């Protein structure tokens, strides 16, 4: 997601302690980020933040981390955090390839990947967040029973992700081929999901673990 550049975005983000890091200086200091020692769920690519802020509001017993590389997008997430007065969420403005610089091995309980860029061209496959190099990062930071929760409206990306994860040695604990037809009461919709669902698009979802 790209928004018009806001020259003031970085200064705005630095004013709030909810934003943990803009330059890597807090990397590997998870214990200092949160007041409570609780399970850690992260969302890679949070968009406008509707999903993760609603999830954090519903689950104060969990610590959440939003990873978003675009400062212009991250300010939207921060605004929602401040509006809801959430104390159990922190924001990181950086790329997913830097995950292991922020989290220690086995430190994370769950990773959310919601409506990631499908990068449909084959030559761009390595940019997909379910490409094997990204899966290796998730495996490093997740606990032994840690999970990846994945949602998309893109059938091609979903099929690719199932194959990529299987080849990487993962197994699936849940697969939904038409999420909104299954009336999942626990489902929290993202901004993209609402838009696609209103158009009648099918939403694909799965949960996976590493062997």
Curated annotation (Swiss-Prot):
Q: Where does the source fall among the domains of life?
A: Bacteria
A Gene Ontology cellular component where this protein is annotated is: tRNA methyltransferase complex
Family label: Belongs to the class I-like SAM-binding methyltransferase superfamily. TrmB family.
Carries keyword Methyltransferase?
A: yes
- Which molecular-function annotation in GO is an example for this chain? tRNA (guanine(46)-N7)-methyltransferase activity
What is the annotated signal peptide range for this record?
Answer: none
Q: Where does substrate bind?
A: 121, 153, 190-193
The protein's matches in InterPro entries, at most eight in alphabetical order, are given as: SAM-dependent_MTases_sf, tRNA_(Gua-N-7)_MeTrfase_Trmb, tRNA_methyltr_TrmB_bact
| HAMAP family named among the record's database cross-references | tRNA_methyltr_TrmB
Q: Where does S-adenosyl-L-methionine bind?
A: 43, 68, 95, 117
Name of encoding gene: trmB
Q: Can you say what this protein is called?
A: tRNA (guanine-N(7)-)-methyltransferase
Instruction: Give the reactions, separated by semicolons, that this protein catalyses.
Output: guanosine(46) in tRNA + S-adenosyl-L-methionine = N(7)-methylguanosine(46) in tRNA + S-adenosyl-L-homocysteine
| Active site positions | 117
This enzyme's EC code(s):
2.1.1.33
Which keywords label this protein?
A: Methyltransferase, S-adenosyl-L-methionine, Transferase, tRNA processing
Q: Pathway, per Swiss-Prot/TrEMBL?
A: tRNA modification; N(7)-methylguanine-tRNA biosynthesis
Q: Does the keyword DNA-binding apply?
A: no
The record's function comment reads: Catalyzes the formation of N(7)-methylguanine at position 46 (m7G46) in tRNA.
């Amino acid at each position: 997601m790209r928004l018009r550049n806001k020259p003031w975005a970085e200064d705005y983000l630095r004013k709030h302690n909810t934003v943990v890091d803009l330059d890597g200086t807090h990397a590997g200091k998870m214990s200092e980020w949160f007041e409570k020692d609780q399970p850690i769920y992260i969302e890679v690519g949070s968009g406008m933040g509707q999903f993760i802020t609603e999830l954090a509001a519903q689950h104060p017993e969990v610590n959440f981390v939003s990873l978003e590389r675009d400062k212009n997008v991250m300010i939207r997430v921060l605004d929602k955090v401040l509006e809801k007065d959430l104390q159990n969420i922190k924001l990181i403005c950086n790329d997913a390839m830097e995950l292991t610089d922020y989290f220690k091995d086995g430190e994370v309980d769950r990773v959310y990947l919601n409506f990631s860029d499908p990068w449909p061209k084959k030559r761009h496959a390595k940019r997909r967040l379910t490409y094997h190099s990204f899966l290796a990062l998730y495996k490093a930071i997740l606990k032994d029973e840690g999970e990846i929760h994945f949602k998309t409206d893109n059938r091609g990306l979903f099929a690719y992700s199932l194959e990529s994860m299987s080849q990487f040695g993962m197994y699936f604990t849940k697969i939904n081929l038409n999420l909104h037809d299954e009336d999942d009461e626990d489902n929290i919709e993202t901004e993209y999901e609402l838009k696609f669902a209103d158009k009648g698009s099918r939403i694909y979802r799965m949960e996976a673990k590493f062997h």
